Design a protein with these regions (language model features):
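A short acidic, Gly/Pro-enriched loop at the edge of an enzyme's catalytic core
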Residues: 106-117
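A short SAM/SAH-binding and catalytic strip from SAM-dependent methyltransferases
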Residues: 116-129
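Class I SAM-dependent methyltransferase SAM/SAH-binding core
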Residues: 51-107
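Conserved alpha-helix/loop element of class I SAM-dependent methyltransferases that forms part
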Residues: 29-48
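A short glycine-rich, Lys/Arg-flanked "PGG" loop and its adjoining helix->strand segment in the class I
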Residues: 131-143
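N-terminal, positively charged/glycine-rich alpha-helical extensions of SAM-dependent methyltransferases
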Residues: 1-19
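Class I SAM-dependent methyltransferase Rossmann-like catalytic core
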Residues: 16-30
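Conserved class I S-adenosyl-L-methionine
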Residues: 146-166
Length: 166
């Protein structure tokens, strides 16, 4: 049982294959309120750039694009998710506003002072080096611009995982 739990947990950090797709759908449902609040909080213009760390299947990116029509950038460690996020965001891609990469937030491949906003939902738990990741985000964010990081508390996760309630 421990191996199965560990395997499924790893899928939330690096979704791959059919199980990874299912995990992303579950995340889309569980994180829906976070997505809505994140989109509402991000205040950008269509000529600005936003970076989403851990874009998964592109669900949040699509919501951001639908509201702001901004340039969308994303970095995720999952090759499979790049494919899914690209197909989910065809409209932004056709407009030349979708720029997805496979990689790690601890080594962001962007110039300093590039983004007007950076978002991340429930990914910080999986970063290889939290301090380095935060430092990289600070480097690529324009001065005074926000980093939106939404996470669940340990207590909330325990309610969901162990008591089966949301």
């Amino acid at each position: 049982m421990k191996k199965i739990t560990k395997y499924i947990g790893s899928q939330f950090g690096n979704p791959r294959g059919i199980i990874g797709k299912v995990c992303c759908i579950i995340m889309n449902v569980i994180n829906n309120a976070m997505y809505r609040n994140m989109v509402r909080a991000i205040k950008i213009q269509s000529d600005e750039k936003v970076l989403d760390i851990g874009y998964g299947n592109g669900y949040l990116l699509k919501k951001i694009y639908n509201k702001h029509h901004a340039d969308l950038y994303g970095i995720d460690i999952s090759v499979d998710m790049k494919e899914q996020a690209t197909s989910r965001n065809i409209e932004a891609m056709k407009a030349g506003k979708l720029h997805l990469q496979v990689g790690d937030c601890c080594n962001l491949p962007y110039d300093a002072d590039t983004f007007s906003a950076v978002s991340s939902i429930n990914t910080i738990y999986f970063w290889s080096d939290t301090i380095k990741g935060l430092s990289e985000i600070n480097r690529v964010l324009k001065t005074g611009k926000p980093f939106f990081n939404a996470v669940y508390t340990k207590e909330w996760l325990e309610v969901v995982l162990y008591k089966g309630r949301i």
